[in-house]
UniProtKB/Swiss-Prot annotation:
<protein>
    <recommendedName>
        <fullName>Small ribosomal subunit protein eS32</fullName>
    </recommendedName>
</protein>
<dbReference type="InterPro" id="IPR007836">
    <property type="entry name" value="Ribosomal_eS32"/>
</dbReference>
<comment type="similarity">
    <text>Belongs to the eukaryotic ribosomal protein eS32 family.</text>
</comment>
<comment type="subunit">
    <text>Component of the large ribosomal subunit.</text>
</comment>
<keyword id="KW-0687">Ribonucleoprotein</keyword>
<feature type="region of interest" description="Disordered">
    <location>
        <begin position="1"/>
        <end position="25"/>
    </location>
</feature>
<dbReference type="GO" id="GO:0006412">
    <property type="term" value="P:translation"/>
</dbReference>
<dbReference type="Pfam" id="PF05162">
    <property type="entry name" value="Ribosomal_L41"/>
</dbReference>
<keyword id="KW-0689">Ribosomal protein</keyword>
<dbReference type="GO" id="GO:1990904">
    <property type="term" value="C:ribonucleoprotein complex"/>
</dbReference>
<dbReference type="GO" id="GO:0003735">
    <property type="term" value="F:structural constituent of ribosome"/>
</dbReference>
<dbReference type="GO" id="GO:0005840">
    <property type="term" value="C:ribosome"/>
</dbReference>
Length: 25
């Protein structure tokens, strides 16, 4: 069950993380 919400949240977090990384750079 933990992997289920982790996989769905991972997709959203991955997009937000990409923006944060570009801002940090």
């Amino acid at each position: 069950m933990r992997e289920k919400w982790k996989k769905k949240r991972s997709r959203r977090l991955r997009r937000k993380r990409r923006k944060m990384r570009a801002r940090s750079k």
